[in-house]
Each structure stands twice: as structure tokens, then as C-alpha cells.
Amino acid sequence: MPDFSIENEISKLINNKHCTIVGVDEVGYGSLAGPVVSAAVFFPKHDNHITYNIQDSKKLTPKKRLEIYNIITPMVKWSIGLAEVHEIDQYNILNATHIAMQRALRGLNSNIDYVIVDGNKVPELPWNAKAVVDGDNISISIAAASIIAKVTRDKLMETLHIQFPQYNWNKNKGYGTKHHLESLHKYGKTIHHRNTFAPASGITKLYNK
């Protein structure tokens, strides 16, 4: 289970028990449709006795994710950043993800001391930062960010599903399930599909109601 070990190590390293250490994670990296969404999360207190079963969002059921989301969002400082489909197509998914992370961090409007990012790459930032491989299984701040980003993006894709029900986005959230791929070939691609991602990149037919 993730805990505050990394956050506490960084606090000791910079000799500041009350520093602002922000965890960052994203969702939607490999999706065929919809934006990439990042969350930035700061816990005012590092108390390992108060974990609320926070863990990598991928290990939680949708019901449990929402339950934890509702518990933690009032008690942490958090912000969301998005990179839209046209930005993913223009800049590539890695750069668009970094843009989403930068937007999430700027949205905190806080004096940030240190940033910990899930993965092996850190976006260009004006703060000290480090990448943490498998960070959503190690750091509570990153795990909380993964939950908030996931719940936020899922809600967004469920809203888009109302307009485009053929693609089943309320269930697959834009990822390449069999049903989604079949619908993509049958109905064509929408404005929410990533043109630089296969198979949308090879489909010329556009969705028309």
C-alpha cells in the first residue's frame, strides 16, 4: 500500500517539515478518444494512520474509487489539468500529458516546494521535481492524484457518451475495447477521437448523426 515515505524523505532532505510536496498522475494516456487528464494533490498532513485505503486507481472498483474520491477531495488541496484531443494530435501524447500536468500544478495556486510525478519522466517545471516509477503504488499523494484524475475523466467520458452512445464510452471510457473498435469502423470517428492513434489514424469516415 502507498504511504508517505517518499514525502517524508523529501521533507527531511529539504529540511522543512511543513513543505508543500505535490503528487501528480494522469489517466487516459492510451485511450483512443477523449482528453488526457492529470491531477495534482497536496496533503497538508503526512499521517500514515489516515490512509483511507488510498491506492492506485487501477486497483479499485469504480464504486470504491468514487467513495475514496468523496472522502479525500474535501481534505486535500487538488487541481485538475487537461490536454484536449487536438493538443494530443499536435504535440504527441507524452508532451500533451506534460502539458496537462503543468496545468494541474498551476491550478493549485500554491507555493510548491517539490513535485513527485508518477512514471519515469518529469515535465518541464519551475519547481524541484522527481519521477517515481510505479509511484501510484508507493506514494499516497500520487495514488490520490490517480484516483481524482480517474474519477474526473470517467465522468467526462460518461457525459460524452450521451452525445455519442454508439461508442459505449460510459463503459470503455474511450479505450480500445472490441465494441469500441467495431463502432469506430462502422460509424467512423468523432471529433473526440485521436487522429494520431491507430485505428482512428487510418479511418477517413467521419461520424454523422
UniProtKB/Swiss-Prot annotation:
InterPro entries: RNase_HII (IPR022898), RNase_HII/HIII (IPR001352), RNase_HII/HIII_dom (IPR024567), RNaseH-like_sf (IPR012337), RNaseH_sf (IPR036397). Its main location: cytoplasm. Its EC number is 3.1.26.4. The keyword Nuclease applies. Pfam families: RNase_HII. One of its GO terms (cellular component) is ribonuclease H2 complex. GO terms for biological process: DNA replication, removal of RNA primer; mismatch repair. Endonuclease that specifically degrades the RNA of RNA-DNA hybrids. This is Ribonuclease HII. It comes from Ehrlichia chaffeensis (strain ATCC CRL-10679 / Arkansas).
